[in-house]
Amino acid sequence: FRLWDLCDQCCINLFRYTSYAYGKVREYAASDEEFTRRAGFALLATLAVGDKRASDDDFRPFLPLIERGAEDSRVRIGKAVNWALRQIGKRSRGLYPDALALARRLAAEGGGGGRGGGGGGGGGAKEGPAARRIGRDAVRELTLERIIARIK
């Protein structure tokens, strides 16, 4: 990928319909290449909205991946990480508390204390301001009364 919108459109209109979409989330998120890594989180956000058959347990294991992804200082990746976190939080009442807790932790602390491995990737990753920005933005959206009222 070379453009964020092409990356997102492929996730929204193609990749999410494949049988291997969930596996690709981790594979793409582990990449050091900016748009490939973005695709991992954009695909996760798309699945959180579009895969109505998936359970909360299908998404909960991705929260640590989001936490690691939030440490990446690249803006286009941060926006996709934020998107994934917010969509998982809005998916169900079962996921909402976990997503909101992660958002609050990111906003307060700026991430997971530099934990590595497991798909965090390198390529400009650093703890701190990016994670705090992602956390603050997600908390702001996830605590809106109109958003909370829509969560089922």
Segments and roles (model prediction):
Residues 1-152:
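Alpha-helical scaffold domains
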